[in-house]
């Protein structure tokens, strides 16, 4: 399971002209689910995402996690993160989980974020989404479990 996290001043997701998820300061989390991923992996990745200290403290040092910074999380499913790009000029998505399992683990990840008390917004699984982001920094990290 892969999370590409971006520190955001704001982020939103639009589906068919309607905003389905929107946050102010916090994290945009692009989430990719691979074959063999489990609830345990989703839980561990959630802990890492929410615990990752990439927000500045009073000394302007990256020392606070999203909760400590008072931020929110916008989680967007993105199967392209699991693409194999090692060969050729076309990505292979054979490592991706089947859609039903990917959706289940995506929803589980979101539930884990909410259970930990973080305001969590979402995109719409498998939809054609327009994602907007005002990246703060930019600060972007790739987390994988």
UniProtKB/Swiss-Prot annotation:
One of its GO terms (cellular component) is cytoplasm. The keyword Hydrolase applies. Transmembrane segments: none annotated. Coiled coil: none annotated. Its EC number is 3.1.1.96. It holds the Pfam family Tyr_Deacylase. The keyword tRNA-binding applies. GO terms for molecular function: D-tyrosyl-tRNA(Tyr) deacylase activity; Gly-tRNA(Ala) deacylase activity; Ser(Gly)-tRNA(Ala) hydrolase activity; tRNA binding. It comes from the Bacteria. It is found in: Cytoplasm. It catalyses: glycyl-tRNA(Ala) + H2O = tRNA(Ala) + glycine + H(+); a D-aminoacyl-tRNA + H2O = a tRNA + a D-alpha-amino acid + H(+). GO terms for biological process: D-amino acid catabolic process; tRNA metabolic process. Its main location: cytoplasm. Keywords: Cytoplasm, Hydrolase, RNA-binding, tRNA-binding. A motif (Gly-cisPro motif, important for rejection of L-amino acids) lies at residues 137-138. A Gly-cisPro motif from one monomer fits into the active site of the other monomer to allow specific chiral rejection of L-amino acids. Homodimer. Belongs to the DTD family. This is D-aminoacyl-tRNA deacylase. It comes from Yersinia pestis.
